[in-house]
């Protein structure tokens, strides 16, 4: 559970307040999963980087492309320290986790992400979704390990989702899923 003396509270995020606001997600990584075609399918191997790397990307709360987003924040007082967001994909009855982020490196590995994951999983179950689904990158080894720890498995990937150079950039899109029913 939560390991700090302070009181952390999980609350629904108010769409009126947060919609359209941007944030930067950052992560550190020591390596990546190399995914390459083989004669009978695909081979996936972990490859360490020569030195640890930090990557980041900008994102937005309540992205316009989400069907009917549900979001929760982890707060210490009024300070937002973590965030999770998802929405039902009506066409296939899966709940897509569009974001889960503990915003400050110093707050990571303290259980915030796990509490947020349990909260959004319950919300997904309440929608009647058959499965949780999410996207991560082959170079985000900590995220992959976190999702596996929370019962997700790799269900697919796209070698060229972001650019024609994704394999060379070691940033291949990986889809991970967890059956709910």
Name each model feature, range by range.
Residues 130, 137-144, 150-153, 157-181:
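C-terminal "cap" of GNAT-fold acetyltransferases
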Residues 79, 103-118, 122-127, 138-145, ...:
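Conserved glycine-rich acetyl-CoA-binding loop
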């Amino acid at each position: 559970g939560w390991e700090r003396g302070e009181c952390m509270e999980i609350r629904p995020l108010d769409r009126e307040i947060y919609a359209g606001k941007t944030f930067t997600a950052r992560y550190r990584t020591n390596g990546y999963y190399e995914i390459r075609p083989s004669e009978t399918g695909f081979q996936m191997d972990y490859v360490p980087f020569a030195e640890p790397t930090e990557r980041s990307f900008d994102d937005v709360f309540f992205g316009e492309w989400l069907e009917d987003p549900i979001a929760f924040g982890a707060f210490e007082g009024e300070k937002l320290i973590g965030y999770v967001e998802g929405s039902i994909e009506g066409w296939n009855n899966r709940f897509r986790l569009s974001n889960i982020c503990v915003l400050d490196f110093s707050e990571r590995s303290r259980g915030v992400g796990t509490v947020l994951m349990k909260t959004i999983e319950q919300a997904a179950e309440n929608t009647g979704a058959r499965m949780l689904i999410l996207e991560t990158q082959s170079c985000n080894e900590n995220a992959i390990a976190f999702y596996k720890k929370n019962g997700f498995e790799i269900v697919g990937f796209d070698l060229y989702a972001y650019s024609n150079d994704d394999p060379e950039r070691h940033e291949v899109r990986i889809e991970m899923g967890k059956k709910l029913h």
